[in-house]
């Protein structure tokens, strides 16, 4: 693990990144810079390239063209600093909660696993089986499993999409709190625009493989649900998502 990034997160730089599947162009010469420790949400219609972007950053796929860098280093060279959460928590049902958190680790890892579970609010469920947990609790285990590695980059692919509304809000608060404590870089893919503006520093809209909106969320934390400014930003993003025409021009809003 690269300890130099533990307190500041992984900076990301994508230069002219494209991803093709035969004749289907999913990402089209995408350029993106994300400073270390920034919380970025990515929204857009299905098939626009959101999850493909996360898969490239996670090393699950390779770009057809372009460079994916952590600062000046190819991201693939420091993949151990990256962790990813999915909508399905992907817990092994035959292993206890604490064993799922420590999956793949060697040596004296149980104390670290207990600390990670405590940070995720599940310290009292360490010895239980995944089948005994609710959907939200399973995602807390998945979050603890990511935290134990002290990642520089946390990738979130719709991890809250299957949760009920109250549990979803609780998980949003937990993820933001842990991000503030640990300083890792976060990329969240979500179809929920309200979730994006509530959690992120910055919201990107990907359309037809390109970034068509790059919006700074200029709201102090903690953010109050139902605030006028949150509603205005949500409406701005939704208006862009729902519009009929597609412009190639990048729209930026700062401050």
Curated annotation (Swiss-Prot):
Keywords: ATP-binding, Cell inner membrane, Cell membrane, Membrane, Nucleotide-binding, Translocase, Transport. ATP binds at residues 44-51. It catalyses: ATP + H2O + aliphatic sulfonate-[sulfonate-binding protein]Side 1 = ADP + phosphate + aliphatic sulfonateSide 2 + [sulfonate-binding protein]Side 1. It is a peripheral membrane protein. InterPro entries: AAA+_ATPase, ABC_transporter-like_ATP-bd, ABC_transporter-like_CS, ABC_transporter_ATP-bind, P-loop_NTPase. One of its GO terms (cellular component) is plasma membrane. Residues 12-233 form the ABC transporter domain. It is an enzyme of class 7 (translocase). The keyword RNA-binding does not apply. Its EC number is 7.6.2.14. It holds the Pfam family ABC_tran. It is found in: Cell inner membrane. GO terms for molecular function: ATP binding; ATP hydrolysis activity. Coiled coil: none annotated. PROSITE patterns: ABC_TRANSPORTER_1, ABC_TRANSPORTER_2, SSUB. Part of the ABC transporter complex SsuABC involved in aliphatic sulfonates import. Responsible for energy coupling to the transport system. The complex is composed of two ATP-binding proteins (SsuB), two transmembrane proteins (SsuC) and a solute-binding protein (SsuA). PANTHER family: ALIPHATIC SULFONATES IMPORT ATP-BINDING PROTEIN SSUB (PTHR42788:SF17), TAURINE IMPORT ATP-BINDING PROTEIN-RELATED (PTHR42788). Belongs to the ABC transporter superfamily. Aliphatic sulfonates importer (TC 3.A.1.17.2) family. This is Aliphatic sulfonates import ATP-binding protein SsuB. The lineage of its organism: Bacteria, Pseudomonadati, Pseudomonadota, Gammaproteobacteria, Enterobacterales.
């Amino acid at each position: 693990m690269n300890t130099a990034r533990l307190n500041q997160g992984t900076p990301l730089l994508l230069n002219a990144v494209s991803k093709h599947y035969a004749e289907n162009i999913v990402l089209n010469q995408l350029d993106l810079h994300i400073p270390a420790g920034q919380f970025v949400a990515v929204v857009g219609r299905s098939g626009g390239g959101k999850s493909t972007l996360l898969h490239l950053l996670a090393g699950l796929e390779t770009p057809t063209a372009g460079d994916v860098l952590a600062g000046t280093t190819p991201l693939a060279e420091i993949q151990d600093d990256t962790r990813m959460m999915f909508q399905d928590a992907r817990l092994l049902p035959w292993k206890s909660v604490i064993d799922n958190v420590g999956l793949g680790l060697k040596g004296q890892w149980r104390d670290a696993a207990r600390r990670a579970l405590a940070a995720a609010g599940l310290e009292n469920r360490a010895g239980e089986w995944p089948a005994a947990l609710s959907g939200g609790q399973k995602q807390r285990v998945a979050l603890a499993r990511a935290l134990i590695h002290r990642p520089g980059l946390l990738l979130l692919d719709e991890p809250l999409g299957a949760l009920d509304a109250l549990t979803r809000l609780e998980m949003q608060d937990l993820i933001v709190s842990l991000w503030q404590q640990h300083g890792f870089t976060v990329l969240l893919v979500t179809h929920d625009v309200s979730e994006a503006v509530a959690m992120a520093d910055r919201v990107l809209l990907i359309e037809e493989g390109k970034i068509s909106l790059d919006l700074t969320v200029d709201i102090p934390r903690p953010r109050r649900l139902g605030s006028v400014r949150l509603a205005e930003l949500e409406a701005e993003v939704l208006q862009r998502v729902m519009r009929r025409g597609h412009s190639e021009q990048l729209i930026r809003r700062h401050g």
